[in-house]
Amino acid sequence: MNTKKVSRRTFLRAAGIGAGAVALASCAAPPPAAPPQAAQPTTAPAAEKKPLTFVWSPKAVNNPVFDVARRGAQDKAKELGITVEWVGPESADAQKQAELLDAAIARKVDGMGISCNDPDALKPVIDRAMDAGIPVITWDSDSPNSKRITFYSLDNEAAARKGAEIMVELLKDKPNKTYAILTGVPGAQNLEARIRAFREVADPAGLQWVATDPCNDDIQKGIEVVENRLTANPDLAGYFMAGAWPLFGDINAMPKFQAAAKAGMKVVAWDILENELKLLKEGLVHALIGQKFYGWGYDAVGILYDIVVNKKEYPPFVDTGFDLVRTPEEADVFLKKWETGNWKD
């Protein structure tokens, strides 16, 4: 045995391949050994894992309400090391939104977050995504009968009831208690909930509803609708804007609105965009209901990531809460956010 070991070591040194070489088949000197090869895997190596890709779909990309949501989504994507694509129709269009989402399903994206133009029109595409293994959540505007996992939003009904209580308070000493409602896309689940809840409080309290006018989430259309309503009802006592599209633009394009507000018409409006906050400070708007724009992107992307990566379960509805702005001082707090771009605090 010792003789063999010495002979083998001597041979290995002579061959220059060291003591780690494979054992010889016999004691006879073999031909020079090939260089040792790395062990080959029994299966093909796995491809490098690509970053997750989520599609975030607003009702319309031309609506400034969604700009802060986009910023939030981008910030969260950067933190998580994922990609979030901003995919939506230029203007509010449920059919176009569904087509864009179908294209994303075909690309096999990893998840979707959708603000639905219409709950029924978006239900089939949401269900197709879920059936294809693509998790879907909704934010801002829901499709409650779809297979979506959860809905991230303020409680639209609670916020609208609060808005109605404020309108009742503002008009309590006025003999004229007529009011009109401005809405966006007819049938949008979030807007319908706001209108219904507002009227459930306002009408029994003695306020007199005149009309509900849609503007299809379009700023210019909203301006025209409001001016036309005030032409038809110049003595309107109150205006509830379930979305404040006309207030996003140039107030000078609405001379009838300005005149009515200065004459005492009370305005309760959704959202806390920069123009609206300035109008509140000027006394042309009297209460603003603020949604968590930044959270529609930042928080909701985090929720979808938790679902996809961490397999976390969420309830059907996640309540964001809402902000209420009634005083110039409160308006200044949010104007500072617009100025600095810091919406995290």
Regions found by a protein language model. Give the residues of each.
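Hinge/cleft segment of the Venus flytrap/periplasmic-binding protein
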Residues: 50, 182, 186, 190, ...
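Flexible loop/hinge segments that line or gate small-molecule binding clefts
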Residues: 119-158, 178, 273-281, 285-286, ...
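Hydrophobic alpha-helical segments within soluble ligand-binding/sensing domains
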Residues: 97, 152-178, 221-223, 272-276, ...
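Bacterial lipoprotein signal-peptidase II cleavage site
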Residues: 28-36
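Short, solvent-exposed amphipathic alpha-helices that sit
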Residues: 65-79, 159-166, 189-207, 225, ...
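Extracytoplasmic "Venus flytrap"
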Residues: 51-72, 76, 80, 85-101, ...
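N-terminal secretory signal peptides and thylakoid transit peptides that target proteins
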Residues: 2-22
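Hydrophobic alpha-helical
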Residues: 111-131, 198, 216-279
